[in-house]
Amino acid sequence: MKYINQDELLNMTTRYRTQVVNSLSGFKSANLIGTSNKEGIHNLAIFSSVVHLGASPALVGFITRPNTVVRHTLENIQQTKQFTINQVNDGFWQAAHQTSARYEAGECEFKQTGLTPLVIEGVGAPFVRESRLKYALKLKEIVPIQLNDTLLVIGEITNILCDKE
């Protein structure tokens, strides 16, 4: 068994250390977070940090990285207070991963990736039609995590769409 102490961990190259630490919590689900800005332009971004926080009320959160660059997903959620979470499946994982590329604020990731937006009346953010399990949330709280300048974005589930399979 390999043993790695904190000094060894800190002396790893940044990229390798990131890969090691990211893998420690095991398998992570891949999810696409759908948002719209005030002009109605859809945004889509992949996240692996989605976590269940409670059932009553039904709360789910995700971690967003520090604001060292423009974060369209976070900006849109702050503006509209709504977002969707769409589980990625084997039918579109490559297109989902493409959402991690850098796009300008006016560019729609749905168009860039070939994924299909699903808009439902009363929900102010797009779903991903290809996703088998998707749900809408309204923003409840954004919690700053001072240790690494990330944010925990917490939403309450308002709608769930699930394939019958």
Positions of the model-derived regions?
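Active-site-proximal mixed secondary-structure blocks
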Residues: 1-43, 51-165
